[in-house]
Amino acid sequence: MENIKLNPNFQFQWEEKQNCYVLLYPEGMVQLNQSAGEILNLCDGTSNIEKINKTLCEKFEVEDLTKDITVFLIEAKNRDWISYE
């Protein structure tokens, strides 16, 4: 599987004032919900869907999040937030 990384045109960070992760870009900012933030936090260029799923399943003590992760990553790719290597 391909590794996933953030588009370098976006800056991913925790925004204390909003108490959430955000993506900053020249035209503005996108506030992310907790799930989106957790997934994008793992898109470091060394993780694929399987690794992200394993990490989040262990963290949140659930069986499988592959479908939810995949749906989000499709949307993130469509918005050009991520790329596959």
Predicted regions and their residues:
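Acidic, low-complexity/disordered tracts enriched in E/D and polar residues
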Residues: 1-41, 60
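Long, charge-rich, low-complexity alpha-helical segments
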Residues: 29-85
